[in-house]
């Protein structure tokens, strides 16, 4: 039984789905997709549960969410195993994902009070009060790269605010989605407050088409995000929060410590096998001897990265991609770049056919032409050379995306210029592009999305503000507006 609707585990009525390990190819999970009718049932359950959940004292909702955090800690080893096996990422990285999920609970509670709690301002004749109210029924679409952590960044603040949720994990990570929801069940969520529907495109389309939804929170590709935006066009009554991808630039301007710069570039481009939306896709390196030395060392160290299974010992820096198809997509993109005139510096290769284990690739795009502005979601780093910093910033901004941007340089003035001119929601200096704080906004501009998904700023789109002017006693003002006469017995006499 792969669906959780109104507090019951039920069997999907749609197509059968089998999830295999992308490296070892053993079957991990099997179940059935939700039918459109079951998606509708999940929405009805969420709608029915909403009034009582929203009326609960915040402390009661907080207690359940904090119980969920306790269960995450108690089940960390097992959930790590599930996520690592299903995604292909190494054990060490899956463990950090669970830790991030736990840490976001406390931050989300604080964010609720700080950003969307109640604020009272005393006035001479009463008070002005700002309150926040939940939207109602929200759909949450989860991605596959962080199947626990990223949906958690929507679900936790949504529940704290008093919303009810229909959660659709990625069709590539149904096992992780189910494992997380089972912990929510143990935490004591009332029936219908959180509902799980499994499936691919058809399930997603049925969910986003529900007329009774009050909003949709999405993390995933720009293509799907654009489709959802079109589907919900003309429905301003629904909140739509999109966190999408990026074609992110990392500028390298005469680094003083070559190895430190190389380490930062590798962390930016290849962690999670390049499957983070903030990963560096474009490396802009200044022409000259320092830039040449940096590139040579980057190629040398990257060539030593050997992807391996999730439980390999010693642990690898990167594991497999989410699927063999995803690995083949990266190889296809590399070949397309070569056909357009790019020069291969380090060829990406499948470690073993039939698996998703792919070595990182580096390619010089300086002489390539007609390169599409698309996110290649995997370990492929494209290099451009530049002569002056103004040109580097222009190249960095030459994308429809605007998620992350970064600079490796000892020069603070260069970073100050980038801060003013960069078109990105995240701009880092001598820090990996993939580094982010849960207390900071996470998101970008342009094709990278609209709202800022994270434990802190997610509170903003999980509740709407209600302004009130209020006083316990109603009295006639001492000073009246012109034309108003409340003098006793001074009205018009009847004929």
Swiss-Prot record:
Pfam families: Aldedh. Pathway: Amino-acid degradation; L-arginine degradation via AST pathway; L-glutamate and succinate from L-arginine: step 4/5. Keywords: Arginine metabolism, NAD, Oxidoreductase. GO terms for biological process: arginine catabolic process to glutamate; arginine catabolic process to succinate. NAD(+) binds at residues 220-225. It is an enzyme of class 1 (oxidoreductase). It comes from the Bacteria. Its EC number is 1.2.1.71. CDD domains: ALDH_SGSD_AstD. The keyword Oxidoreductase applies. GO terms for molecular function: succinylglutamate-semialdehyde dehydrogenase activity. The keyword Cell cycle does not apply. The active site is at 243, 277. It catalyses: N-succinyl-L-glutamate 5-semialdehyde + NAD(+) + H2O = N-succinyl-L-glutamate + NADH + 2 H(+). Gene3D superfamilies: Aldehyde Dehydrogenase, Chain A, domain 1, Aldehyde Dehydrogenase, Chain A, domain 2. Catalyzes the NAD-dependent reduction of succinylglutamate semialdehyde into succinylglutamate. Belongs to the aldehyde dehydrogenase family. AstD subfamily. This is N-succinylglutamate 5-semialdehyde dehydrogenase. It comes from Enterobacter sp. (strain 638). The gene is astD.
């Amino acid at each position: 039984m792969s669906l959780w609707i109104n507090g019951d585990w039920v069997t999907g009525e749609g197509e059968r789905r089998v999830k295999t390990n992308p490296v070892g190819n053993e079957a991990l999970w099997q179940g059935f997709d939700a039918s459109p009718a079951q998606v509708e049932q999940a929405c009805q359950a969420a709608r029915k549960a909403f009034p009582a959940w929203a009326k609960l004292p915040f402390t009661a909702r907080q207690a359940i969410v904090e119980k969920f955090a306790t269960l995450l800690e108690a089940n960390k080893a097992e959930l790590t195993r599930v996520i690592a096996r299903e995604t292909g990422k190494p054990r060490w990285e899956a463990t950090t994902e669970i830790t991030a999920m736990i840490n976001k609970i406390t931050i989300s509670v604080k964010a609720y009070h700080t950003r969307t709690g109640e604020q009272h301002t005393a006035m001479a004749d009463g008070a002005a009060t700002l309150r926040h109210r939940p939207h109602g029924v929200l759909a949450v679409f989860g991605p596959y790269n962080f199947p626990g952590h990223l949906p958690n960044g929507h679900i936790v603040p949504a529940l704290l605010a008093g919303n009810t949720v229909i959660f659709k994990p990625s069709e590539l990570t149904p096992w992780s989605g189910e494992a997380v929801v089972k912990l929510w069940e143990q935490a004591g969520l009332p029936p219908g407050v959180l509902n799980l529907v499994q499936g691919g495109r058809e399930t997603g389309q049925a969910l986003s088409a529900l007329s009774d939804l009050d909003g949709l929170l999405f993390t995933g590709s720009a293509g799907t995000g654009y489709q959802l935006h079109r589907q919900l066009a003309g429905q301003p009554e629904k909140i739509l929060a999109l966190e999408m991808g990026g074609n992110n630039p990392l500028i390298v301007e005469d680094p003083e410590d070559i190895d430190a710069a190389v380490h930062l570039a590798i962390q930016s481009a290849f962690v999670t096998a390049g499957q983070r939306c903030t990963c560096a896709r474009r490396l802009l390196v200044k022409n000259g001897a320092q830039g040449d030395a940096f590139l040579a060392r980057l190629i040398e160290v990257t060539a030593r990265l050997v992807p391996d299974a999730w439980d390999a010992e010693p642990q690898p820096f990167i594991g497999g991609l989410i699927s063999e198809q995803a690995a083949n997509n990266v190889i296809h993109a590399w070949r397309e770049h070569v056909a357009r005139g790019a020069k291969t510096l380090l060829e990406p290769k499948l470690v073993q056919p039939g698996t998703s284990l792919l070595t990182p690739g580096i390619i010089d795009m300086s002489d390539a032409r007609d390169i599409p502005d698309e996110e290649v979601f995997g370990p492929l780093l494209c290099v451009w050379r530049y002569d002056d910093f103004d040109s580097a910033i222009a190249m960095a901004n030459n994308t429809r995306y605007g998620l992350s941007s970064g600079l490796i340089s000892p020069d603070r003035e260069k970073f100050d210029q980038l801060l003013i001119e960069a078109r990105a929601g995240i701009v880092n200096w001598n820090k990996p592009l993939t580094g982010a704080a849960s207390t900071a906004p996470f998101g970008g501009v342009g094709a990278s999305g609209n709202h800022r998904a994270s434990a802190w700023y997610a509170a903003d789109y999980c509740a709407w503000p209600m302004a009130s002017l209020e006083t316990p006693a109603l009295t006639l003002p001492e000073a009246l507006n012109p034309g108003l006469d409340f003098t006793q017995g001074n009205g018009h006499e009847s004929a």
